[in-house]
A protein has these predicted regions:
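Conserved phosphate-binding/catalytic region of the ribokinase-like
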Residues: 20-128
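Conserved beta-alpha-beta core of the PfkB/ribokinase-like small-molecule kinase fold
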Residues: 1-25, 46
Length: 128
């Protein structure tokens, strides 16, 4: 798993990326270079997962009040990995990542398990 944000992904390839549709071809280029799963966070626009099995899933966490974004990306990675270990299902792992990152961004510190579970229930994803 590699998890750049859309700015970092753009820097790698010398382009500006602002929409999910912009991100996908460059995330696939990372896969061509050896990454299996590419999870790109896009701030308030959510995130997109380009999975090794070919699935492309996009989504957003609920629109809570952002209090502290420090650690939100790390929380997203941790949530994704925990979700993957639970069910070996990309949609579940992606939703867990979105929920963990979103809940942490809306907390003063890292989110609690209850906050993440509540956010998970509000998190919708769709396939591209």
């Amino acid at each position: 798993l590699i998890k750049p944000n859309h700015h970092e992904l753009g820097e790698i390839f010398g382009v500006t990326l602002s929409e999910w549709s912009d991100v996908i071809p460059y995330a696939k280029k990372l896969q061509e270079r050896g990454a299996k799963n590419v999870l790109v966070s896009m701030g308030g626009k959510g995130a997109v997962l380009i999975a090794e099995n070919g699935q492309i899933i996009a989504g957003e966490s609920s629109k809570g009040v952002v209090k502290n974004t420090v650690g939100a990306g790390d929380s997203m990675v941790a949530g994704f990995m925990a979700g993957w270990m639970q069910k070996r299902d990309y949609e579940h792992a992606f939703r867990m990542g979105l929920a963990s990152g979103g809940a942490s961004a809306c907390s003063e510190n890292l989110a609690t398990r209850q906050e993440i579970e509540t956010e998970y229930e509000k998190t919708a994803v769709h396939y591209l």
